[in-house]
Amino acid sequence: MKFNFLSKSVQNYLINKASTLAEALPYIRQHTGKNIVIKYGGHAMGDAALAKKFSQDIGLIKEVGINPIIVHGGGPQIGAMLKKKNIKTKFVEGLRITDKKTVKIVEKVLSKDINKKIVSDINLTGGKAESFSGNINNLIQAKKLKIAIKESDSNIERILDLGFVGEPTKINIKKILISIKKGKIPVIAPLGIDKNGNTYNINADTVAGA
């Protein structure tokens, strides 16, 4: 019989992991075989150490039989790119007012830069992630988001036009389930598309909760 001798550091690592798994065992038993949606914020992914740990944890969740579905944000990264392009943006109720020029940058940052990086990070740590962008193949059908605000002086309510900021009307769950069935971890960029082919920037928390 062949024995593998482990270094002290590897032993400590395995002991720590075993301890973590022991603590998580009730949760694992409760959610084994279930699909869970995890929102991954832009601030967290900006820290290399946190990003690596997140990827490792997602791989571990998949290994124990739970199916993670990642919906990511990207606010800080979008802000940095807009600043680089000398494009000024305003926020209302935490939502970025998004014109046609801005939405193209938002789409690139979310679907091409951030999404691909998360998929790569998960794959590098041993997971099998698959990239999805909500505005491709009608994954996330959307409509323009309308929010009502009251004028402070007159108390009159008016509808604010946020541009290409949307909300989901329908999510094509079938495509995501096919990915999970293939053993993949879906990673979704929070973009949507309407019946006229317009792309919308959607809040990641809204997509995760849809």
Task: Name every feature range the model reports, one short phrase each.
Residues 1-210:
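Nucleotide/pyrophosphate-binding catalytic subdomain
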